[in-house]
From Swiss-Prot:
Keywords: Antimicrobial, Disulfide bond, Fungicide, Plant defense, Secreted, Signal. It comes from the Eukaryota. Belongs to the DEFL family. This is Defensin-like protein 294. GO terms for biological process: defense response to fungus; killing of cells of another organism. Residues 1-26 form the signal peptide. It comes from Arabidopsis thaliana (Mouse-ear cress). GO terms for cellular component: extracellular region. Disulfide bonds join C63-C82, C69-C87, C75-C89.
Length: 92
């Protein structure tokens, strides 16, 4: 009898932990529309992004993984990528 009660306790404990974990991660997700919309421009070795006052400038953001770029920017045509240690918006 104790093993059934223990099994039920562990089952419901895991269910509640899973729910709390999912709820915590969902609240940390930012809206993609809050990220700057960057693009590709010739003669710019980085990203062409809006800065202060809406003026665009060439910006370089370092990265190790594509997720680093996805947390910082949006791209006009395709998703951002991490290329040679820098975030980039490809022109495809």
């Amino acid at each position: 009898m104790a093993s059934r009660a223990t099994s039920l306790f562990i089952f419901f404990f895991l269910i509640s932990c899973t729910f709390m974990l999912l709820e915590t991660n969902a609240s940390k997700n930012k809206s993609r529309s809050d990220l700057p919309l960057c693009g590709f421009r010739e003669h710019c070795d980085g990203l062409w992004c809006p800065g202060e006052g809406g003026k665009y400038s060439c910006i370089n953001w370092s990265c190790n993984f594509i997720e680093d770029c996805e947390k910082r920017i949006r791209c006009e045509k395709t998703g951002p990528c991490c290329f040679d240690g820098l975030c980039d918006c490809t022109n495809f």
